[in-house]
Amino acid sequence: MEKNNKEDVTPLGGYILAKDPISFNEDRPVIQLRVRNSGDRPIQVGSHFHFFEVNKALQFNRAAAFGKRLNITATTAIRFEPGDEIEVSLIPIGGKQNVYGFNNLVDGWAGKSPVAIDEPVETTWLHAG
């Protein structure tokens, strides 16, 4: 058995980076949406949050975001400062596409079927586009 050189040993708690960048979600269909924070507080949206159900103060085409999440790495988020307008990339939610919780607007399957935003949602949740 060959001994490691001092340069080859990773220190305790250390890590080794890959030579090539890691890619993800390459085979997923992506849409772009323009989102504006019309509120007076910063809003942070996590990577796997059902984007259709994000904070009411975010203005965007909610119907287009149905069944989708941010196209960012897991455990990360995008922060929208008050007045910010940001273009985001969204991809379909994976797996069985069952969405429960969040803001309880769906609580069921969020697959490819179109969504009708009913009047209570339209009047209480900002909608642009």
UniProtKB/Swiss-Prot annotation:
InterPro entries: Urease_beta-like (IPR002019), Urease_betasu_sf (IPR036461), Urease_subunit (IPR050069). Keywords: Cytoplasm, Hydrolase. This is Urease subunit beta. It comes from Photorhabdus laumondii subsp. laumondii (strain DSM 15139 / CIP 105565 / TT01). Heterotrimer of UreA (gamma), UreB (beta) and UreC (alpha) subunits. Three heterotrimers associate to form the active enzyme. Belongs to the urease beta subunit family. GO terms for molecular function: urease activity. Pfam families: Urease_beta. Pathway: Nitrogen metabolism; urea degradation; CO(2) and NH(3) from urea (urease route): step 1/1. One of its GO terms (biological process) is urea catabolic process. It comes from the Bacteria. The keyword Hydrolase applies. It catalyses: urea + 2 H2O + H(+) = hydrogencarbonate + 2 NH4(+).
